[in-house]
Amino acid sequence: MYTSRLLLSNLASCLSLATLVASFPANQQDLTFAKRNGTFEQSVFYGLTGPEVEAKLAKLKADGYRPTSLNIHGSTSDAKYAGIWTKQTGDDFETILGANKTVYDAWLDSHKAQGYVSTHVSATGGSSDALFAGVMEKVPSVANWIQVCGLDNPYAYANATIDEPMYIKGVSMYGAPNERQYCILGHENLVNYQQTVFYQTDYFKKDYAKLLQSETSKRHWRPVFIDLSEDLLPTPIFDDTSVGQWVARTDLSASELEAEIAAQKAKNLYAVHIAGAGSKGSKYAVLFAEHLSPLERKWTVTGEVTGFKTNDVVAKDMDAVMEEFMKKNSVRQAQVAASVNGTVVAERSYTWAESDRAVVKPTDKFGLGSVSKMFTYAATTNLLNEGLLNHTTRVYPFLGMNNPADNRSLDITVDHLLQHTAGYNRDIKPDIGFIFRNIALERNQTTPVSLRELIEYVYEQPLDFTPGTDSVYSNYGTMLLSYLIANITGESFNSYIHKNVLNGLDVELYPTSPELNANNPIVQETKYTFYPAQDPASTKQVSNANGGDGSIREEAIGAFGLRASASTISQFLANHAAYDIGPRQAYTYRDGTIVGSRAFAQSQDLIDWSLILNTREYESEQKWEQLVFGPISQWYKYALAE
């Protein structure tokens, strides 16, 4: 069914336009693409009037084409249409074109009652005379969806969802400047699908070029949707799904769009999204991709379980828990490993990812977050045992720093740093491990702040409480310890632990630079970006996993700057405490979190084990706790091999 604002008296003229539409090659391109498994056909149209697009879509539907993208733009008296239809099988769908809000809402409600789901929505005009175009499909996989039009503020959409997790399928901004309206469509987010949506408002307009740069600085991220307002403000949506090669173009005239479609066709890339603005001299935004739909994810397990009487049962149980968690939380990469007396008895690596991502191996290294602190505590243990330090050593005087802003700083001891009682409270002030860029800006410094400079900065600030009177978790404590260790030993902290702590285990610095991580098989997944701490003068944002969080991992190595495999962590626990100084301590654990990683290490009665993910952006902290303290941790259920 096609519903239109056109009167029935115009029906005959609409139907007679089929040949007229075909006579405007600049406004449509019917394309055939060669594929390894055959060919597919696609129709891209733009600049069509209501009668033209009605005739076009009726014929396309009759010929087996389905909607990939649909857009209405221009004035209400001269609305234009752009769209992409692809020849393929699929669920039943219905389309509406050029309807006012009353007609559109009635159509939407009627089809929703019949089990249809809104998949495309577009609007043009003002709040009182807006015209709408849309598609509804019978999509069994979408149980719940919410679409709200006529919003004055796009952020009010969250109120309509009543905290129900949604991923945004489409946005249409219409109306005049200072009188803007928004139509937003969301589908229920059942698998923690990650995306970023950048709404444009009159009080906060975002530069699309900068957004494109920053969002695509995250590995595998790309634009998946762009809306154009009549004054050419792009509203983009980005995500980390995979479609092979892709290209994004904006601000194209009709002739430039025609040339771009031809150029991308020559590269075997085809249009997957189109939006327009204006009735005359229209401008277009278009996205091209190698694959029409995102690649499906595949579940892969590598590694072995060798140290139990029922290895197959252990492997099956581990795999089931991890598969359920990773699929529900959209986690792509993970490892679990267990050791007894330093010998690995189980190591499993899990991948829930597209074919363009690496399959995780047991030897791959993940970021450890605060699990890195185990190595700082072990190094401190060495120096305590050798008499080079003691628990009561006053840290700042030992470093030759005797005139702090707060005299209480002189009383901070090694034990205070180990026990998180040194006087630093990250609930009162920002976490010191993540203020490298802030310090540089405060000092008008264009070079990255070193750990020594950070220590000097903190030394010049008042404490939050008297050392020893309270305990608040502190990244700065182990950062200061790592500096103290380097000062005492005369070598870098990294060098010292490799020579004196690791005993050949494969642990290394996790570099901050995105360039140094570009080919890392383990992707530090996050949707967040900001300006890089390692380049304070930069005006380009980067992934928070690459310094956008304000940290420099090279300088914070003693707190959260290392990476290793889960197997390595489980082996290290054979001789070292998980959370304290000294040798192995049963029934203790350490939990680490940093952008792009979540890690857990625990010593039980006989088993030492570790679990690591390549993201911390899962559904909730409760889900994480249910994972690490749930069945995956119940190693006592399985008898060890004799």
Swiss-Prot record:
EC number(s) stated in the UniProt entry for this protein: 3.4.21.-
Pfam families, A to Z: Beta-lactamase, BTRD1
UniProt-listed InterPro entries: Bact_CellWall_Synth/Modif (IPR050491), Beta-lactam-related (IPR001466), Beta-lactam/transpept-like (IPR012338), PGH-like_rpt (IPR049511)
Activity control, per UniProt: Not inhibited by phenylmethylsulfonyl fluoride (PMSF; serine peptidase class S1 inhibitor), clavulanic acid (beta-lactamase inhibitor) or ampicillin (penicillin-binding protein (PBP) inhibitor).
Disulfide bonds: C149-C183
GO cellular component terms given for this protein: extracellular region
Catalytic EC class: hydrolase
Principal localisation: secreted
Record carries keyword Cell wall biogenesis/degradation: no
MF-aspect GO terms: serine-type endopeptidase activity
Record's signal peptide: 1-23
SUPFAM superfamilies: beta-lactamase/transpeptidase-like
Family from the record: Belongs to the peptidase S12 family.
Protein name listed in UniProt: Polyglycine hydrolase
Naturally occurring in which organism (per UniProt): Epicoccum sorghinum (Endophyte fungus)
